[in-house]
Amino acid sequence: ADSVDLKFSAGIAELIYDPIHLKQTYLEGSLKNKQLVLDFNSKNDTVQVLHISSSLVFQKDTLKLHIYPENLTLNNKQWEIPEDNNIVIAESYADFQNVLLSRNSQKLEISTKIPKMKVDHIGILFENFQLQTFLSFFNPDEALAKGKVEGDFVILNPYAATGLAANIDIKDFQVLSNPLGMLTLDASSKSLSEYG
């Protein structure tokens, strides 16, 4: 580091807590002109399991996050995200623009603009999404859980009396290679005033 730039690196060589087995995982970053550029990596020996590059900008009480689409890797595979993706978070405000991760027919979207929602919300929408895509980070050699996720999970009114609405199916659900069939989550808040 000097008076203008700050660079850092932190990571682990290996962490084993059965069935979790993290291999070489590290975070590198550099701060320049109030912009923090982060590079998160996880490797299984020589294979890149996970790679996410992003930039964070702090402006007063607001945090802006952008995920770089170049070399976005989840579960050893290249993924796509729109170049103009943007996440803005403040004390009582969040906005997720074009935060849509996709690969072939798999999609995961985080949004604050789900059409059927009438109150402030933050939602995660799944389409043909394989659970192992994220869980491979915790054990790249053995599937902790598998299944195809469809549906949505929404946090309602996240800055006050928070509630939730969820309609998720996980088809062909397995945990540690044990088949469990279909898992369904269908939940909604009775009244937002019951929370808080």
PLM regions with names:
Residues 1-196:
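Interface amphipathic segments
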